[in-house]
């Protein structure tokens, strides 16, 4: 569990839900990422009160490293047969870990993930599935899933279970990708991934969620920075550092060409339009939007971003 400036009532709900997990053999590793609004001395009593069924340990980063790096350090430090990653504001159903563990063993998978109920700030359920609030979120199962996973993830960190040895072999994480995206991609390259339609957590959707769709995108400039420049860095890192077979190398090479073409097109090089369209299979919606971007009034562009956030398109 990585913690940063937690809302204490949400944190307690999360911890309470961990404490009643029916899976019998747990150990909780907690790292506070140098919180600025909540002191470690405030967090420790909540942990002590809520976590009584299994051992835990807590440590503190001397400077803010971000959740990706914090989860990387926890992955390096933790011991066990499986790792489950935990947010600070969700609620896990009691059978979450036992169902995921049974599935990963039965299916001989590298990673298993579940769907989730969506709740709001007040804990009220607003959707029975993540797919109801994210139109393009499609769960997949099986082998050979890297063809699209390099670009788009479906396994949320708070809802997955991964074999510990596989997670450790994935280190260091891609510094430009969300940790759950990279772990899922790494596992897909090694073997089978299983997605369960059954929701096993109550995921709290709010404006501060790190991986919320189009978080931080407000205009063309922020769109380019978050949805294009960051993705270019992600796939370049994979292309240069990820060990894989020739088939995946080709996918990463063409994916990098597509991303770099998008980046140059947005910067004014309209000769890249054909290349964007050539590789549109990676994301038809993004390709269409960005080809049209130079001709869209700013108000229309912002309306499209708003509509995408609201799951209308």
Residue ranges of each PLM-predicted region?
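C-terminal subregions of glycosyltransferases and related glycan-biosynthesis enzymes
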Residues: 150, 177, 189, 193, ...
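Nucleotide-sugar donor-binding/catalytic module of glycosyltransferases
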Residues: 1-216, 307
